[in-house]
Amino acid sequence: MTFKRKISVCRLPKLSVFCILYSVFCLLCSSCAISFKFNGASIDYTTTKSISVADFPNNAALVYPPLSNDLSEGIRDLYQRQTRLQVNQKGGDLELEGEITGYELTNMSIAADSYSAETKLTLTVHVRFINNVRPEESFEKSYSAYQTFDSSRMLTDVQEELCATMIKEIAENIYNDTVAKW
């Protein structure tokens, strides 16, 4: 009997310490909040509720007609998917406007027959970001993206796919600079 009693006496302090530590841990966890954001946005939703994304007109020398609408909608869609901001045409707490300033083809590598083997398609967009909540975060900047394709293919055959890729890249860069702060 004395042997069993010794074991239970030794367990009592360890059990008490465990209970105390567990209680302290529970109190700390209930008083602290840990938040993980996987979209990278650093928006204070108590002060910033909306973003307006104006249409981006195409002022480039070479014009691909759907580009203006595709870019504007691509940017709006990204903010709708990645944030809780209300996306408006105008009058938002955050404002994005700009224009397509460049859409050009450049010959890249030269093949053995002295003709271009690859062509680079470059899209350039000038953006004005106005933060009406924190004006010091407003900026004006140009964004570019490019894609290359085999020169044996016609631009009309690859244009839609290449533009979609470039629009996605530019929209993500704009998003990162405006609300993600990366």
Predicted features, each with a name:
Residues 12-13, 21-24, 28:
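Short polybasic linear motifs
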Residues 47-49, 137-143:
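Short coil-to-beta-strand
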Residues 31-73, 77, 84, 176-182:
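A structural "domain/chain start" motif
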Residues 39, 81-86, 93-138, 146-157, ...:
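Surface-exposed short loop/turn segments
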Residues 1-14:
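N-terminal secretory signal peptides that target proteins for export/translocation
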Residues 57-64, 153-161:
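Second-shell loop/turn segments in exported
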Residues 159-182:
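Compositionally biased, intrinsically disordered linkers/stalks adjacent to structured regions
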